[in-house]
């Protein structure tokens, strides 16, 4: 996702507790991270989601950022107010990327927190193998209107194998 929207020198706003694949993408494309430090629940000792005022402050201090990445939910199941973050980012011309590695289930129930795509995110990465009952390594990349799907395909072709597993594709 990051390689699809960021180029060398572009800024992207993201939580400090992103997956290492996001950091690796920053290294590959040369984008500059603008970190939002999520609060930690003192009782449980776990990171919470990104607070909207913190994202707003990061946008105010970095109006040239091109995107905001949100963990939805976090590894611990905490969801940020992704609707508000999408609205805020889009109002400033920024794309929203939803890392939904642990959010497969959000697409399958009305009484669950809102999914990234339902909230209007531009891209969402879903790891079907983590909470969707699929084989390890299987995932889905969802692309919304306003994102050049052909360019996303080009980026995917640069970074994934030419010998895909037919078990995972099925």
Show where each model-derived region lies.
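Conserved PLP-enzyme active-site core in the AAT-like
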Residues: 1-170
